[in-house]
Design a protein with these regions (language model features):
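Short active-site loop/helix that positions an aromatic residue
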Residues: 76-87, 100-104, 247-255, 459-474, ...
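Conserved "right-hand" nucleotidyltransferase catalytic core of DNA-directed polymerases
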Residues: 1-17, 24-33, 37-40, 118-119, ...
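Active-site-proximal helix-loop-helix substrate-binding element of RNase H-like nuclease domains
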Residues: 34-172, 184, 192, 487-494
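Function-dense linear segments that define catalytic or interfacial modules
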Residues: 411-499
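Generic long, charged, amphipathic alpha-helical segments
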Residues: 485, 489-500, 561-583
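Alpha-helical scaffolds flanking conserved acidic
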Residues: 92-97, 182-186, 500-511
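Short active-site oxyanion
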Residues: 64-70, 236, 450-453
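Conserved catalytic palm subdomain of right-hand nucleotidyl-transferase polymerases, strongest
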Residues: 5, 72-73, 93-97, 446-462, ...
C-alpha cells in the first residue's frame, strides 16, 4: 500500500536559531496526516483546541505496518519525527522533494511543496494564512484547528499529485536513465535519516577546553600580529579582522574612489588594463604619527560657549580629531608589506583580496625572497583566520546545535548542491581538517562505555574517479602504482618558483579534474595546469567530449544515469565553452 505522510509539529528558538527537529524537549508532535487509497486520516496529538485522537498511536502504527511505500515531501523530517515519537517504519520511501531535485537535472529551482505543486498546475490551492501565523510567532498547536487540518490535508493531496506527475516523467524515455539514480537516492535518504536521528555524542567539558585553547591562541596571535602592524602602519588605527584594512596593509595601496573602483575593475580585464586602473584609481598608503589634539587637549570633546560667553550645558565632539583625542600626520614613508597584485582576479570591491589562497601565495613569495618576518606574519595571519573559523563554525556550531542530552544531530542533505554532492548543516562539519590532531575531534565520543569511533577517508578519490571515467592511461598507471599525485603537484609548483606544501597543493590537483584552467593564477600555479593537460591528455580529451556533448544535447548523462542540463551553454569565439567547470 502506498501511503502519503506529513507531520505538523511545533518549533522553538534557541541561541537565535529556529529548531524544527524532535530532539528539542520543547518541540511537540501536533498532528500526523496519512493518505492511503483515497482515505485521508488525520491523527491529533497535542493541539490547544482539540483533544488527542482516541487510539491515535494504534491508528498511526497500523497504517505504517500496512504501508509498502511511504511518500513524503522532505522525508528526513517526517521520518525523524515518527521514529522519535516511537513509531516504527523500515520500508521503502519516496521523497517528492528529491524526485523533483533529480528531474531538475542540476538547474537551480525552488523545491518547496507549494512551488512544485504550482509547477505541475495541481488543482489544490495552499492556504497562505499559515505563513502569517508562523511569522507572528504563533505556535503550530495554537493555529485554529480547522485551518491547520485543512493545511495538512492540502499537503497530503499535493504530495500525492506531485508523486504521480513525477512517476510519469521518470517513465518517459528521455528520463529513463535516471531510474537507478532515483532508487539509489531514496535508499540513501532513508540511511541519512537514520544517521541524523542517531546523532553523535559530544563531550561538552572537552568542547569548553578546546574553545579555551583556541581563544588563548587567538589572543597570542592577535598580540603578535598587532605589534608588527604598528611597525608597518605607524599609529594608524587598524583592525586586523577588516578585509578592507588588511588589503591596505598587504598591498600598501587603496582605491581613491571605492565606488568607481568597484564599477571599473573586473576579473576578466587584461593584465595591462588592470595595471593601468591600479595606477590611476588607487593611491599609496603611508605610515602616520599620532599627536595629541590641540583643540580638545586629547579629550575628544570641546567646551563651546553661548552667545553670552557662558559654557554650554553639554560638550561637543571635537571636529579636529573626531573624538579620538589625537590627530595623525602623514610621515611620507610607505606603509604595509608593499606587495603588488599581479592581475585583476586579485581585486575586490573595496581594494584587493586577501583570501586564503592569496595569502598562501604571498607567504611563499616572501619566503622565496628571504623576507622571513613578512612570511611569518602572513603565516600567523592565516592561522588567526583559521582559528576564527574554527571558533565560529565548529565550536560555535557544536555549542548551538548540541541537544540537552549531549547528542549532536548533523544533517547531510541531498538537495542543496547542483552536483548531487552531500552538504552538511546544523552545523556543517564537512570542512573539518583531516587528521587526528585537529582539536575539535576530541569532543566526539562514543555513546557506549568503552566504545570507539572510527574515522575513514578515501585516498585521492577524485583523481581515481577521473582516471576511471576518462580511461587516461597515465592516470590509471599512477593509481595502480600508488603514485602520490598531491606531492607531485606540490613539486611542480615549487620548481616553478612558488614554494608550496603537499596539503596546500591538493586544491590544484583537484581543480583541473573539474575543468579549471590556469587562468587568473600565479605563473607557478599556471605552469602546473599547463603541465597537467599535457601529462593527462586522456582527462583533457574527456573534458572536451563532455563539453561537446553539452553543446549538442544541452545535457550530459553520467555513467550512473544521472542527467545534468546545460540550457544556456555556448561556445566562445576562442573555442572554449561557457560553464566549463560546471560541465
Amino acid at each position: 500500500m502506498i501511503t502519503v505522510l506529513d507531520v505538523e509539529n511545533t518549533t522553538c528558538k534557541r541561541d537565535g536559531k529556529q529548531h524544527f527537529d524532535p530532539f528539542e524537549a520543547e518541540n511537540e508532535l501536533v498532528m500526523i496526516g496519512m493518505l492511503s487509497e483515497d482515505t485521508e486520516t488525520v491523527v491529533t496529538f497535542t493541539h490547544s483546541d482539540e483533544e488527542p485522537t482516541v487510539g491515535g498511536d494504534v491508528i498511526t502504527q497500523d497504517i505504517l505496518d500496512a504501508t509498502t511505500l511511504l511518500v513524503c515531501h522532505n522525508a528526513v523530517h517526517d521520518l525523524t519525527w515518527i521514529w522519535e515519537c516511537g513509531f516504527k517504519y523500515d520500508g521503502k520511501i519516496y521523497d517528492t522533494m528529491l524526485g523533483e531535485y533529480i528531474l531538475n537535472k542540476g538547474v537551480k529551482s525552488p523545491l518547496n511543496l507549494g512551488f512544485v505543486s504550482a509547477q505541475y498546475q495541481l488543482e489544490e490551492q495552499k492556504l497562505d494564512t499559515m505563513s502569517d501565523y508562523w511569522k507572528s510567532g504563533t505556535s503550530t498547536k495554537d493555529i485554529p484547528f480547522d485551518e491547520l487540518d485543512e493545511y495538512l490535508r492540502y499537503d497530503l493531496r499535493s504530495t500525492l499529485g506531485v508523486y504521480k506527475k513525477q512517476m510519469k516523467r521518470f517513465a518517459n524515455e528521455e528520463n529513463s536513465s535516471m531510474q537507478s539514480v532515483l532508487d539509489l537516492t531514496m535508499d540513501t535518504c532513508f540511511e541519512l535519516a537514520l544517521i541524523y536521528k542517531r546523532g553523535i555524542k559530544v563531550d561538552m567539558v572537552e568542547l569548553n577546553k578546546v574553545k579555551t585553547e583556541f581563544e588563548e591562541e587567538r589572543a597570542t596571535l592577535s598580540e603578535e600580529l598587532n605589534e608588527f602592524v604598528e611597525e608597518l602602519m605607524g599609529d594608524t588605527p587598524f583592525n586586523i579582522n577588516s578585509p578592507e584594512q588588511l588589503s591596505t596593509l598587504v598591498f600598501s595601496r587603496k582605491p581613491t574612489d571605492k565606488k568607481q573602483w568597484a564599477l571599473s575593475v573586473n576579473a576578466f580585464m587584461s593584465d595591462s588594463a588592470f595595471k593601468d586602473a591600479m595606477r590611476s584609481m588607487t593611491g599609496p598608503v603611508y605610515k602616520t604619527k599620532a599627536s595629541k589634539c590641540f583643540m580638545c587637549n586629547g579629550t575628544g570633546m570641546v567646551q563651546l560657549l553661548t552667545k553670552k560667553g557662558t559654557p554650554r550645558k553639554n560638550k561637543n565632539i571635537c571636529k579636529e580629531c573626531n573624538r579620538q583625542g589625537f590627530t595623525l600626520k602623514n610621515t611620507k614613508e610607505l606603509a604595509g608589506l608593499k606587495f603588488t597584485p599581479p592581475k585583476a582576479t586579485w581585486a575586490s570591491a573595496s581594494g584587493f583580496s586577501t583570501g586564503k589562497g592569496i595569502l598562501e601565495t604571498l607567504e611563499a613569495t616572501a619566503r622565496g625572497k628571504g623576507m622571513e618576518r613578512e612570511g611569518d606574519f602572513l603565516q600567523k595571519l592565516r592561522r588567526l583566520n583559521a582559528i576564527e573559523s574554527y571558533l565560529s563554525s565548529f565550536v560555535g556550531g557544536i555549542e548551538k546545535f548540541t541537544k540537552a542530552d549531549g547528542m549532536l544531530h548533523v544533517q547531510l542533505t541531498q538537495h542543496i548542491t547542483s552536483t548531487a554532492r552531500l552538504s552538511g548543516r546544523n552545523p556543517n562539519m564537512q570542512n573539518m581538517p583531516r587528521g587526528g590532531t585537529f582539536p575539535v575531534k576530541r569532543v566526539f565520543i562514543s555513546r557506549w562505555k568503552g566504545g570507539k569511533i572510527m574515522e575513514a577517508d578515501f585516498g585521492q578519490l577524485e583523481f581515481r574517479v577521473a582516471a576511471y571515467l576518462s580511461q587516461d592511461k597515465t592516470a590509471i598507471k599512477e593509481v595502480l602504482e600508488g603514485f602520490d599525485v598531491h606531492q607531485y603537484t606540490a613539486d611542480i609548483i615549487t620548481k616553478a618558483g612558488q614554494a608550496i606544501g603537499r596539503q596546500n597543493a591538493k586544491m590544484h590537483t583537484f581543480a583541473p579534474l573539474y575543468g579549471a584552467s590556469g587562468y587568473g593564477r600565479t605563473p607557478a600555479e599556471a605552469e602546473y595546469y599547463t603541465h597537467f593537460m599535457y601529462k593527462y591528455r586522456g582527462i583533457a580529451e574527456w573534458h572536451k567530449r563532455l563539453a561537446t556533448e553539452a553543446l549538442s544535447d544541452r545535457k550530459i548523462t553520467t555513467p550512473s544515469g544521472r542527467q545534468f542540463a546545460f540550457p544556456d551553454v555556448s561556445r566562445r569565439r576562442d573555442g572554449t565553452v561557457t560553464n566549463f567547470t560546471m560541465i
